[in-house]
């Protein structure tokens, strides 16, 4: 049995960063609990109104990562093999470059500062903090080793990605639809952000219930959601492999016909509620849309609908092949 451990620390020295040189500093602020910067008009956000964007490719030293892994391995003993591994990762960056061009990589960043040029390091969209894998395999030989059966199980457990809680439209007039959510500290504070109408009061109740059922938002009450602060739930997945060998020897040559059966997401085959991946009920977690500001400058919102329904939970099962089991059958000949 062997144990292997590894730790890696890295520091960004010249990480890629884009910024819009035509972006002016915000010229106002909202009032109330969410007093983030804003632009009072669309014209106020540009240094030169005749130019839409002036993207500059730059570098930043802000950011870094730490990772740790441990692997415990049990070598082949009487046909048995086993391995257990754990990995931890924490990474910060200013930009993970979430776009195909400089402009989209810049505009796809989420912020509450009112200007995507003014960003601090946040958790990387690629940073999955914990991951566990395991392999167990056993080979059985019989009939004078003319036949053999191998059964293997492969386990993986981890979160499946990160996301940001943002509004579904441009609340601060910066021209970018990626403003991070403010999470009210109390139910009474939440009411400030919705019109004092029957629909507004109902939306405030829905929003507060949504916060209470979301483990991340509950911890951020009275503050802003973080860029890629949301983490998708863990998925526990087991794959199974079955190998059946049929061997004969002619002279000095051994001929083996091997039948293989691979069951992907074997957990889901056992129970349709197991091995399921999750997706956000409303696209990218954008459950609120900005509708107006009060005369005093307090932003007002409405809860978005999903297929005519108001969202009451963060996640739902993703109806894709990744949430279902599959089978592969193969036949190989060795000589």
State the predicted function of each range.
Residues 319:
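CBM-like carbohydrate-recognition segments
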Residues 77-82, 225-249, 253-259, 263-270, ...:
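C-terminal substrate/ligand-recognition segments
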Residues 1, 66-70, 130-136, 236-242, ...:
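Hydrophobic, lipid-facing positions within transmembrane beta-strands of outer-membrane proteins
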Residues 8, 14, 36, 50, ...:
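Intrinsically disordered, low-complexity regions of eukaryotic proteins
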Residues 4-146, 151-160:
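Gram-negative outer-membrane beta-barrel transporters
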Residues 4, 15-25, 94-102, 161-179, ...:
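Outer-membrane beta-barrel and related beta-rich outer-membrane complex signature
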Residues 150-251, 258, 283-316:
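Extracytoplasmic gating/loop element in the C-terminal half of outer-membrane beta-barrel translocons
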Residues 23-32, 38, 47-50, 99, ...:
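Extended hydrophobic/aromatic segments used for targeting, binding, or gating
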């Amino acid at each position: 049995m062997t144990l292997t451990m590894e730790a890696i620390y890295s520091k960004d020295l010249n990480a890629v960063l884009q910024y819009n040189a035509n972006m002016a500093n915000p010229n106002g602020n909202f009032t109330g609990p969410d007093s983030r910067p804003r632009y009072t008009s669309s014209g106020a956000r540009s240094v030169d109104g005749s130019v839409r964007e002036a993207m500059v490719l730059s570098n930043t030293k802000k950011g870094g990562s730490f990772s740790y892994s441990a692997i415990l391995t049990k070598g082949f003993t009487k046909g048995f093999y086993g391995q257990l591994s754990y990995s931890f990762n924490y990474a910060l960056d200013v930009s993970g470059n979430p776009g195909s061009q400089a402009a989209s990589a810049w505009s796809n960043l989420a912020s509450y500062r009112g200007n995507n040029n003014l960003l601090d390091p946040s958790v990387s969209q690629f940073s999955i903090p914990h991951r566990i894998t395991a392999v167990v395999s056993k080979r059985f030989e019989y009939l004078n080793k003319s036949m053999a059966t191998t059964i293997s199980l492969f386990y993986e457990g981890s979160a499946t990605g990160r996301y940001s809680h943002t509004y579904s439209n441009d609340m601060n007039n910066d021209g970018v639809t990626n403003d991070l959510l403010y999470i009210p500290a109390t139910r009474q504070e939440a009411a400030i952000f919705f019109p004092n109408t029957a629909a507004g009061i109902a939306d405030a109740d829905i929003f507060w219930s949504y916060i209470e059922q979301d483990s991340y938002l509950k911890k951020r009450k009275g503050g802003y959601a973080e860029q890629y602060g949301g983490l998708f739930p863990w998925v526990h997945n087991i794959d199974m492999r079955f190998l059946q060998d049929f061997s004969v020897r002619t002279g000095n040559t051994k001929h083996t016909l091997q039948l293989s059966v691979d069951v992907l997401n074997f957990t889901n085959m056992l129970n349709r509620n197991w091995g399921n991946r999750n997706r956000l009920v409303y696209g990218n977690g954008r459950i609120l849309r900005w509708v107006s500001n009060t005369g005093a400058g307090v932003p007002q919102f409405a809860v978005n609908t999903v297929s005519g329904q108001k969202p009451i939970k963060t996640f739902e099962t993703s109806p894709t092949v990744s949430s279902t089991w599959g089978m592969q059958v193969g036949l190989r000949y060795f000589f």
